[in-house]
UniProtKB/Swiss-Prot annotation:
This is Uncharacterized protein Mb2597. InterPro entries: ATP-dep_Glu-Cys_Ligase-2, CP_ATPgrasp, DUF403. It comes from the Bacteria. Pfam families: Alpha-E (PF04168), CP_ATPgrasp_1 (PF04174). It comes from Mycobacterium bovis (strain ATCC BAA-935 / AF2122/97). Transmembrane segments: none annotated.
Length: 884
């Protein structure tokens, strides 16, 4: 294949590309069995070393880009993932994420920029085999929770099936409407050295990854638009439409306008993004257990004191956690009474409870026989040979070859890679197998093909696999054309399907004219019409939006005050003998009052300015980027991001681009630089970018979010937080009388922190007085930064809440604050008492500050109260609030 002119100009033609790739492949072949699967079928080049026709365009594109281009491509993909907020939460094997672990942090999704390209001919084989396998598993599921003929006829051993954790006794008798009992199926496959495909695992409990697959397509298509246009891979988005129609069709027969929800374990789930992104694509609300309740045998969703009927649940919570009454009692992820509602036929849950039994590794041993019995067909996709310890001859083979097999327990889910075990471990395992042979299966080690990856700007080779998806339709099963590809971890970890990155799967179109037309089952209209989608307004969702408003406002205000304090520090650190320099310790004290953390400086006559100079840089550093420092800027940003992820389906896509930039800006895990100038540059950038990001998010919320009850609650949080911050700041800066020069410097800094210095100068022509400041910052209803403006907006927001009577307790409390404020006068607030304090001003500010806290507490205990026994996602008393 001749290199293109542009590729040659780049000095990185196809021949050089292949030479580097062959070197990487040669290194793979050096691995023996103990090290990993080694090199098998090569997706990219044939046995003669020539690029396969399916990959020709990609090879040209990579050669044309060269190393620099591949580096840029990696950077672009990383940036797009960052901007879209695509995350993955790695779960420690020793933790139970489903019962809640608040120490888990989502990390960025890892996506290889180079797609895994599949020819049209290969896809025809995969699609036919995948659909057949879904039909087979559907028939098995219907039989196991129905007539059980495969058990009574002795085809399947009951001891192997019923001991598997995927079997749910409470699911017996539950029947989904329609022809199919298996709603959604995911299948992990790889290619064998002879080019055929092999199934390594089936996922039927709550299949994950379809959201990631469609997000990957969006990222890669944006990263390489020219290549995407040239190859024209078949789209994945029709699968989302097929899934949406199937969910509507799955509703109970009595439902006329079905309401569908996606039930998530929450943001600490391993695949929280996958769930939220899929819910957004489908246009269905993402809910958690706290949002749902069973009443009168029906499932309802909470909505500010009212209930809305739910007809279909797309379940992403494992079955045993779905109902703490009938299943796992300690679950905080399920809905009490959900099993009973299913038995009554008032709600459809998909995948149905009990579908996890199809993930039993022992079942693989019997699939060929089951296919012949239930479908009268031979399997089109084969599985690696499996030996069940419950059959004497197979037990002997298992024990004799335990060191070269993948050993799995059908009871605990434990998986052991035989080649990695020591002699003692192998002996111990043999004893365990002989003691309870029916609990164990041995599987021949899976084999994988290799494909190109972008490794550090160089075309490399790595083992790859695929996860493919189907969804039930009235006339059969519809596959996602493409799926979630993955790059396998090196070494023996690959045998357990451990991955290091994802890959987009590009299926080449056929040459037939109708190649891009989706099959009839996908586009068939549902028997029912789904209800219009609506925003979730349950207490949990509203609480997260409320805290989004608070944390966003807190971060904005904190960034401004930190900027002002840092700038004044640099102005006056060499002018300590001037009266104006007193503004620095006053501002530092204000930071301490607002965050509730000692800033190691005082604002009274006893402070030591030399100590202030020594402490201020480290204090400003920790208040900006130290996540363990109470009230720090990074803490507010983290709180905002956490709340946003909990309501991802409610927010604009632009939110994640802004949040990603802000999170990066305040992420600084190392110690501060020794150089004051370098440290100041880091702080200046972090503070400025955070401020810009918060202003952008405020604009996005105001202009891109529907102003429904969720937006109203977010604005309530914003108004309360701005009022709390303003009263705390003014109390710290203006309640004590100081030298006129110091007072002017303090007033100027305070106005800048309040984003009101320009309007103040325009109104007062440069004259500084506390009376004028209070007039502007407390009483001016046209100033969006004033206290009265916050109270008026807060009153209007409370009135807009559903069920507002006009005289609820929060509304009365706001009215009382408004009355108290309007009875005060700027001139009186400026008056100084005998002890040198502006006592009336301090009393007013302290009183309103306390009242605003009370309003927040009342809202938390009423409109935002979670059901009994539930906790906010931070856990009990974990939200970070400003001190009283």
């Amino acid at each position: 294949m001749a290199p293109s002119a542009s590729a040659a100009t780049n000095g990185y033609d196809v021949d050089r590309l292949l030479a580097g790739y062959r070197t990487a492949r040669a290194q793979e072949t050096l691995f023996d069995l103990r090290d990993g699967p080694g090199a098998g079928y090569d997706e990219f080049v044939d046995d003669d070393g020539n690029v396969r026709p399916t990959w020709t365009e990609l090879a040209d594109a990579v050669a044309e880009r060269g190393k620099a281009g591949l580096d840029r491509l990696r950077s672009v993909v990383h940036s797009l993932i960052d901007h879209d907020g695509i995350t993955y939460t790695a779960i420690d094997a020793h933790r139970d994420a489903l019962t809640g672990d608040h120490d888990l942090e989502p990390g960025p999704w890892r996506l290889d920029p180079l797609p895994l390209v599949i020819s049209a001919a290969d896809w025809e084989v995969l699609e036919a085999g995948l659909v057949q396998r879904s039909r087979l598993l559907d028939a098995i599921l219907a039989d196991l929770y129905g007539p059980r003929s495969m058990l009574t006829e002795g085809v399947l051993p009951p001891e192997m099936l019923f001991a598997h954790p995927g079997y749910v006794r409470a699911a017996n008798g539950i029947q989904m409407p329609g022809r199919h009992q298996l709603f959604m199926h995911a299948c992990d496959l790889s290619r064998l050295p002879d080019g055929t495909f092999q199934v390594n695992a089936d996922w039927t409990q709550a299949p994950s990854g379809s959201g990631y697959a469609m997000a990957d397509r969006r990222v890669v298509a944006h990263a390489v638009p020219d290549l995407y246009e040239e190859l024209a891979p078949r789209p994945t988005t029709p699968f989302a439409q097929a899934l949406r129609l199937a969910l509507i069709d799955a509703a109970p027969d009595v439902a006329q306008d079905p309401v569908v929800v996606v039930l998530s374990p929450g943001i600490y789930s391993e695949t929280a993004f996958d769930q939220a992104y899929l819910a957004t694509l489908l246009g269905f609300p993402l809910v958690e257990s706290a949002d749902l309740v069973v009443r009168d045998g029906k499932l309802w969703m909470r909505s500010l004191g009212t209930l809305k009927r739910v007809d279909v649940v797309l379940r992403r919570v494992d079955a045993h956690y779905a109902d703490p009454l009938d299943l796992r009692a300690d679950s905080r992820l399920g809905v009490v009474g959900l099993v009973e509602a299913q038995h009554r036929g008032t709600v459809t849950v998909v995948n149905t409870l009990g579908s996890g039994i199809l993930e039993n590794p022992g079942l693989l041993r019997f699939l060929p026989q089951l296919s012949e019995r239930l479908l009268d067909e031979s399997p089109l996709l084969h599985t690696a040979p499996v030996y069940w310890g419950g059959i004497a001859s197979e037990r002997s083979h298992l024990l004799a070859n335990v060191s070269s097999l993948l050993i799995k327990s059908t009871v605990s889910g434990e998986t052991l890679v035989g080649p990695t075990l020591s002699s003692a471990q192998l002996a111990d395992l043999a004893v365990r197998i002989e003691a309870m042979p029916w609990q164990w299966v041995g599987q021949e080690l899976p084999q994988f093909s290799s494909a190109p990856t972008n490794h550090a700007g160089v075309l490399s080779s790595a083992g790859v696999g695929m996860r493919l998806f189907t969804v039930a339709q009235r006339s059969g099963y519809a596959p996602m054309i493409g799926g979630l590809g993955y790059v396998l971890a090196p070494g023996p970890a690959a045998y357990t399907l451990k991955t290091v990155a994802a890959k987009d799967i590009w299926v080449r179109p056929t040459e037939r004219a109708h190649a891009e037309v989706i099959t009839v089952p996908v586009l068939a209209p549902p028997a029912k019409t789904g209800a219009g989608t609506w925003a979730v307004s349950s207490p949990r969702v509203l609480s997260d939006l409320f805290w989004m408003g608070r944390y966003g406002e807190r971060a904005e205000n904190m960034a401004r005050l930190l900027i002002v304090t840092r700038e004044r520090y640099h102005v006056f650190r060499h002018q300590q003998d001037t009266d104006e320099s007193e503004c620095v310790p006053v501002l530092m004290a204000a930071l301490g009052k607002i965050t509730g953390y000692d800033t190691a400086t005082g604002a009274g006559s006893a402070y030591d300015r030399a100590d202030m100079i020594a402490v201020a840089p480290s204090t400003l550093w920790s208040l900006t980027v130290d996540p363990d420092r109470p009230g720090s800027l990074v803490q507010s940003v983290e709180g905002l991001a956490l709340a946003a992820r909990a309501v991802r389906d409610q927010l604009s896509n632009d939110t994640w681009m802004v949040l990603a930039n802000v999170e990066r800006a305040v992420e600084h895990k190392s110690d501060p630089p020794q150089s004051l100038a370098e440290a100041d540059a880091v702080l200046a950038s972090a503070q400025a970018e955070t401020l810009a990001g918060m202003l952008t998010l405020s604009g996005v919320a105001g202009e891109s979010m529907v102003h429904d009850v969720g937006w109203t609650m977010m604005d309530i949080g914003k108004r309360i937080e701005r009022g709390l911050w303003l009263t705390a700041l003014l109390q710290a800066t203006l309640s004590t009388v100081r030298h006129p020069a110091a007072e002017q410097a303090i007033i100027e800094a305070t106005l800048v922190a309040c984003e009101s210095s320009v309007i103040y100068r325009r109104r007062t022509v440069g004259k500084f007085s506390v009376a004028a400041v209070t007039e502007l910052m407390l009483f001016d209803a046209q100033n969006p930064r004033s206290l009265v403006y916050q109270l008026e907006r807060l009153r209007a927001d409370l009135k807009d809440l559903p069920g507002s009577s006009g005289s609820s307790r929060p509304e009365r409390m706001v009215d009382e604050m408004n009355t108290r404020l309007r009875r005060s006068h700027p001139e009186e607030l400026e008056e100084v008492s005998a002890d040198g304090l502006r006592a009336e001003l301090a009393e007013l500010l302290a009183g309103i500050h306390a009242s605003l806290r009370d309003v927040a507490d009342v809202l938390t205990a009423t409109q935002l109260a979670l059901p009994g026994g539930m906790q906010p996602l931070w856990g009990p008393d974990q939200r970070r609030v400003m001190p009283a």
